[in-house]
Amino acid sequence: MPTVNQLVRLGRKPQKKKTNVPALQACPQRRGVCTRVYTTTPKKPNSALRKVARVRLTNGHEVSAYIPGEGHNLQEHSVVLIRGGRVKDLPGVRYHILRGSLDTQGVKDRKQGRSKYGAKRPK
């Protein structure tokens, strides 16, 4: 507990909040190159094969990023854009790949929620 004199001299320092997405370095998105594209299984009550890519970012960080939507065209050396946002049942996956930008195609035949999956408006 500080004294009144210490508070007058130094004041209170605001506590810094730890970021959930350190590799983005306060940017909304980051570009990177896929080093490995693979599937992995989720945590205990769930069961699936989740699509994940290991991405080397332009700032040198290497992160795991989730590939949302049904089907994708990513392979090694694909250039992708990642955003923050974790996948709750995949430990260590804190980023999402943005569909429909750079080398990532949008989800085919997507009718609803298209903007999140980079799908064009159906004719």
Curated annotation (Swiss-Prot):
The keyword Ribonucleoprotein applies. Residues 113-123 have a biased composition (Basic residues). Pfam families: Ribosom_S12_S23. The keyword Nucleotide-binding does not apply. One of its GO terms (cellular component) is small ribosomal subunit. The modification 3-methylthioaspartic acid is found at residue 89. Keywords: Methylation, Ribonucleoprotein, Ribosomal protein, RNA-binding, rRNA-binding, tRNA-binding. One of its GO terms (molecular function) is tRNA binding. Coiled coil: none annotated. CDD domains: Ribosomal_S12 (cd03368). GO terms for biological process: translation. Residues 102-123 are annotated as: Disordered. Belongs to the universal ribosomal protein uS12 family. Part of the 30S ribosomal subunit. Contacts proteins S8 and S17. May interact with IF1 in the 30S initiation complex. PANTHER family: 30S RIBOSOMAL PROTEIN S12 FAMILY MEMBER (PTHR11652). With S4 and S5 plays an important role in translational accuracy. Interacts with and stabilizes bases of the 16S rRNA that are involved in tRNA selection in the A site and with the mRNA backbone. Located at the interface of the 30S and 50S subunits, it traverses the body of the 30S subunit contacting proteins on the other side and probably holding the rRNA structure together. The combined cluster of proteins S8, S12 and S17 appears to hold together the shoulder and platform of the 30S subunit. This is Small ribosomal subunit protein uS12. The gene is rpsL.
